[in-house]
Amino acid sequence: MVGVGKKFTKESKVREIQKNLHKRAKLKRQYLKTLEQEGYEVPEEQKRQKPSFEQRKGEKKQKVDEKKEHARRRKREQKEEMEAKRQRELDELERAKVRQVERERRNKRIQQKTRSGQPKMGPRINDLLDKIQKDTTYTS
């Protein structure tokens, strides 16, 4: 099993890419050589212009500014989110207090008794009537 290695390792991928690059470079050299031999004009390779120090410095500064702006925006959004969450919690606490007060008032009304200790039916019936009126299944 000579020559059979792992096909999908990082090293094999790197080797394959380098092999392809060398192959392309070799083909390009051969093409340019045949053009020259046949008498055609060989195009000059254009050198890549490296950005100047000032341009690179400006780009770096721009990237840093973008990162800072992104961080500021994210911090502001988090602050707004926290404030909204806090407000929701306060509203929920307020609603819970109102429900508790209403529940206590209702229980006090229902627990009323006559002089002989019997429960009063009027407040209980009124409470049931209120429940029926609030429920949408009974009203159309």
Curated annotation (Swiss-Prot):
Q: Which domain of life is it from?
A: Eukaryota
**Listed Basic and acidic residues bias regions:** 44-69, 77-105
What's this protein's name?
rRNA-processing protein FYV7
Write out the ranges of the annotated region (Disordered): 36-140
Which family is annotated?
Belongs to the FYV7 family.
Q: Write down any Gene Ontology CC term.
A: small-subunit processome
Q: Which cysteines are joined by disulfide bonds?
A: none
Q: Which UniProt keywords apply?
A: Coiled coil, Nucleus, rRNA processing
Coiled coil stretches, renumbered: 59-112
Q: Does the keyword Nucleus apply?
A: yes
UniProt-annotated location(s): Nucleus, Nucleolus
Function, as annotated, reads:
Involved in the processing of the 20S pre-rRNA.
Q: Which InterPro entries match?
A: Fyv7/TAP26, Fyv7_fungi
Task: Tell me the GO BP annotations in alphabetical order.
Answer: maturation of SSU-rRNA from tricistronic rRNA transcript (SSU-rRNA, 5.8S rRNA, LSU-rRNA)
